[in-house]
């Protein structure tokens, strides 16, 4: 049987939008933990403004994610490809933060129903999220199909707050298969100036994914914006909650520079003839005050919008 991780990666790349909202079966199989470390156990966390925010500037739209904030600066909800993910908080709260219980979304389309729930959050002493659990389920009465999965994330960071490693573990089942599981990790490498150089995905001792960056111009990332081009492609293409938390700054500080190119490679240990490569050519439009107005990937443009600490849009 072909390597499960590679098959799921290929499927995600070919049907990105469809996967995200209608077939999350492949979510996170692409990036699970090889390590024997225990996934941290969490629960409610104090959830306010992350330490990655510079001068109060926060995104309301970036990398296809649209974010709405409460008056106290906490996130109300986020929209990803037309699906709204709601941030659920405890009734009691302190000034500047709330107790985050879960992030949830539901979607129905004819005879198909889907549900996402992220919970069991871990908040580290550096102010960033150290882990969470994502549960997904889907039932399609039209095709007599169902599937369920649970993904557990663990994040570690460098001393300067930049993400260093993502460990993951997943268990799943569906209408055809019994329960099964997988694991793997992503590792990040930076240069001496704080620019992201490489992301490597491994599973069971095999490197199946590499994402390497090139810099030809000196574009400073003034407001520490975590564009999703600075995260693993096969993870951002399959997990909407990861996308939201990354863009809003809860998964660490971003690369200090913005790359102009990314070279991606996907490897299959059993069928090397199916290995693939891809190149992203990255272009940015940056305002005179350092805010990213938009960026493009191979010509496809993504709008970015930001607000200041007073919730006023920055022009």
Regions found by a protein language model. Give the residues of each.
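Bacterial N-terminal signal peptides that target proteins for export
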Residues: 3-18
């Amino acid at each position: 049987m072909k390597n499960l991780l590679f098959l799921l990666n290929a499927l995600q790349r070919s049907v990105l939008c469809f996967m995200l909202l209608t077939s999350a079966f492949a979510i996170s199989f692409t990036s699970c933990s090889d390590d024997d470390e225990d996934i941290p156990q969490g629960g409610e966390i104090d959830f306010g403004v992350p330490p990655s925010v510079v001068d109060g500037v926060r995104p309301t739209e970036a990398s296809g994610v649209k974010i709405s904030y409460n008056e106290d600066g906490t996130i109300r909800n986020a929209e990803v490809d037309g699906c709204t993910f709601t941030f659920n908080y405890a009734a009691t709260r302190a000034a500047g933060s709330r107790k985050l219980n879960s992030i949830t979304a539901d979607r129905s389309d004819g005879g198909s129903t889907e549900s996402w729930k992220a919970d069991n959050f871990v908040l580290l002493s550096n102010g960033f999220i150290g882990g969470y659990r994502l549960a997904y389920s889907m039932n399609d009465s039209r095709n007599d199909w169902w599937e369920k999965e649970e993904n557990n994330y663990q994040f570690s960071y460098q001393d300067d707050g930049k993400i260093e490693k993502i460990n993951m573990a997943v268990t799943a089942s569906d209408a055809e298969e019994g329960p099964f599981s997988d694991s793997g990790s992503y590792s990040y490498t930076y240069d001496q100036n704080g620019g992201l150089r490489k992301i490597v995905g491994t599973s069971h001792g095999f490197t199946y994914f590499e994402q390497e960056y090139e810099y030809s111009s000196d574009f400073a990332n003034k407001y520490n914006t975590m564009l999703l081009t600075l995260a693993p492609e096969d993870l951002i293409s399959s997990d909407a909650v990861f996308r939201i938390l990354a863009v809003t700054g809860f998964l660490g500080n971003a690369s200090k520079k913005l790359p102009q190119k990314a070279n991606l490679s996907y490897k299959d240990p059993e069928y090397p003839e199916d290995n693939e490569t891809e190149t992203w050519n990255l272009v940015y439009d940056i305002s005179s005050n350092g805010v990213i107005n938009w960026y493009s990937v191979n010509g496809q443009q993504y709008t970015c919008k930001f607000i200041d600490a007073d919730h006023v849009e920055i022009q």
